[in-house]
Regions:
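Hydrophobic alpha-helical membrane-association signature
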Residues: 72-76, 125-128, 281
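Hydrophobic alpha-helical segments typical of transmembrane helices
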Residues: 128, 132, 188-191, 200, ...
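A structural preference for short, pocket-lining loop segments at secondary-structure junctions
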Residues: 50-60, 74-117, 134-147, 164, ...
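Crotonase-fold acyl-CoA enzyme core
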Residues: 135-154, 158-297
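Glycine- (often His-adjacent) and acidic-residue-rich active-site loop
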Residues: 11-15, 20-28, 33, 96-132, ...
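C-terminal alpha-helix plus adjacent terminal tail
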Residues: 1-53, 87, 99, 212-214, ...
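Short amphipathic alpha-helices within nucleic acid-binding modules
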Residues: 65-68
Length: 386
């Protein structure tokens, strides 16, 4: 009887059809701010599976916390399409450069300086954004979100579109919408109720309070969690987070909550004095890729298609209406919110005076450029007050 290698040699076609949409390198679309790398796939014993690879799609904009520009979105669409049709690819690893951020969402500088006040332009941008999310949800290969740092706002949305999330435990998660002039309708309002339930989804999507990777794991957004901080040569859990007990004295769940007061400050000091090492994160990602390698490929794809349906159904039902609303919102609240984030500083803060705005709207004032300029001027004036 012929061996498997002999059968492959005799029956493989001499020419393979190229199913890529365009013959362009991913990096050429965005000046290298998205990288596409094929890394050798490995078995569980660490040996290389010859001719098979894992596709790494890497957000490479660390100076802006790996926020995505319009050109980066185009590159991501192409990258996921390329990985999806590549016969040699086992799994996709979606991550960011460095250890500070996986992704913090859209590029607020671009939002504030180009899209604010231009709803017709932002509507076209959101077509690209929607296609990016759909390309993740429609990828024929399992997609692993390697959370190397904070996953916030739109970064949380594209992260939740992935099939698996493995995070280092210094990373924070959360939404930014109503705090910065938007609503989390780029996927979060579709995915969160499915993934963590309506009540917790409401908390995350409206209050926009960041939460720890440990809490993300408790809620069910993260399937794999590893320490990243080394102190004295040994890995330790995130010292700003409660990890040594499940309940407080009243029986309330506190595991994964941030510490407070002096304990939190001590944790920050410990992080500052330690060393960040992502080797355990990489090992966990490789382990998952190896497990995925040892499955029937078409059965894997079908399983992905079926298990994605709850997220995909909600996404497809809402994405076009969301695109229209987000475009129009660029004339008022988004225009103010993104400008505040872009023009504000650590000293002034990056949020407008919400109470003043609400007081004005309660009296029926219309949205105008003058109102927005006034909100920004009041924000910047805080510098002198402080």
């Amino acid at each position: 009887m012929a061996t498997t290698d002999e059968i492959i040699g005799k029956t493989a076609p001499s020419r393979l059809v190229d199913h890529n949409l365009v013959d362009r390198e991913v990096e050429s679309l965005c000046g290298g701010m998205v990288r596409y790398e094929k890394r050798p796939a490995k078995r569980r014993d660490g040996s290389t599976a010859e001719g098979l690879f894992n596709a790494w799609i890497v957000l490479n904009n660390p100076k802006q916390y790996n926020s995505y520009t319009t050109d980066m979105i185009k590159a991501l669409i192409l990258a996921f399409r390329r990985a999806s049709v590549d016969r040699e690819v086992n799994a996709v690893v979606f991550t960011g450069t460095g250890d500070k951020a996986f992704c913090t969402g859209g590029n607020t500088k671009e939002y504030a300086e180009y899209y604010a006040g231009n709803p017709q332009e932002y509507r076209q941008y959101m077509r690209l954004f929607n296609d990016m999310v759909s390309s993740i949800l429609g990828c024929d290969k399992p997609v692993i979100c390697r959370v190397n740092g904070m996953r916030i706002g739109g970064g949380q949305e594209i992260g939740m579109a992935c099939d698996f999330t493995i995070a280092q435990d210094l990373a924070n998660f959360g939404q930014a919408g109503p705090k910065h002039g938007s609503a989390a309708i780029g996927g979060a309002t579709d995915f969160l109720p499915v993934m963590i339930g309506c009540e917790q989804a409401m908390v995350s999507g409206t209050l926009c309070e960041p939460f720890s990777a440990h809490k993300a794991a408790r809620l069910g957004i993260v399937s794999g969690l590893v320490p990243a901080l080394k102190i004295g040569g040994s890995f330790v859990a995130n010292p700003t987070v409660i990890t040594d007990r499940m309940l407080d004295e009243y029986g309330r769940g506190v595991h994964g909550d941030f510490r407070t007061g002096a304990a939190y400050k001590e944790g920050l000091a410990a992080i500052k004095g330690g060393e960040v090492d992502l080797s355990l994160l990489d090992a966990a990602v490789e382990e998952l890729c190896a497990k995925l390698l040892e499955t029937f490929p078409e059965c894997m794809t079908k399983s992905l298609e079926e298990l994605r349906k709850p997220k995909l159904s909600a996404w497809n039902a809402n994405k076009e209406n969301s695109r229209a609303w987000l475009a129009l919102n660029m004339m008022n609240e988004a225009r103010a919110g993104f400008r505040a984030f872009n023009e504000g500083t650590k000293e002034t803060g990056r949020e407008i005076d919400f109470v003043k705005l609400r007081q004005g709207l309660a009296r029926g004032i219309p949205w105008s450029e003058q109102l927005i300029d006034g909100l920004i001027a009041a924000l910047l004036a805080r510098r002198s007050e402080r």
